[in-house]
Amino acid sequence: MRSAVQWRLCWENDLQLTDHVELSDFFRKIYGRIGSFDAKPFEGGRSWAGARPEVRLIASDAQGIAAHVGILRRFIKVGEVDFLVAELGLYGVRPDLEKLGISFSMRMVHPVLQQLAVPFAFGTVRHAMRSHVERFCREGIAAIVPGVKVRSSRANVHHDLPSTRLEDVIVLVSPIGRSIDEWPPGDVIDRNGSEL
């Protein structure tokens, strides 16, 4: 049975403390399934793990938050080219709604990205999510950019670790204001900041 979800667009400054607490609980449950380390950033009512989103799309139903995606406009560097993207992150769907098609409702992200006037949307996922994101690619919503690593600043200072990390993740690019053919070549993407 499909849940009747309602999507809302929320700018970060419009969220109230109660919103952050509810989102924090949602993320601890979603990311806690991967491991307690992944849920840790969301303790204490914090609704972000690294960089804070600029805008969020939040789906809710009678049981609370059903799904979430965060968006942050930023300049990244691919090879020698700096350019604006909308980074997508903090993606999650409540477990009872997985495989019911709610992820396809994420298509409402595209009009928001068009309003933000970005050439591309960019996001990363773990390799374990490959089959999930390949569905979006088959429908032309996004393309997987193979053989690319992503360098990011760490969200917190750790005296025993370097200030940046280089990750081997799946890179997804969605053409918004330009053709996918205009995505610059390069084997490293520099976020020049923390992961969303």
From Swiss-Prot:
Predominant location: cytoplasm
What is the name of the protein in this document?
Nodulation protein A
Q: Is the Cell membrane keyword given for this protein? A: no
Q: Which GO terms describe its molecular function?
A: acyltransferase activity
EC number(s) from the headed UniProt entry:
2.3.1.-
Q: Name one GO cellular component term.
A: cytosol
Q: What does this protein do?
A: N-acyltransferase required for nodulation. Acts in the production of a small, heat-stable compound (Nod) that stimulates mitosis in various plant protoplasts.
Q: Where in the cell is it found?
A: Cytoplasm
Please state what class of enzyme this protein is: transferase
What Pfam families does this protein's entry cite?
NodA
Keyword Transferase present in the record's keywords: the answer is yes
Give the keywords, sorted.
Acyltransferase, Cytoplasm, Nodulation, Transferase
Origin organism of this chain?
Mesorhizobium sp. (strain 7653R)
Q: Which family does it belong to?
A: Belongs to the NodA family.
Read off the lineage from the record.
Answer: Bacteria, Pseudomonadati, Pseudomonadota, Alphaproteobacteria, Hyphomicrobiales
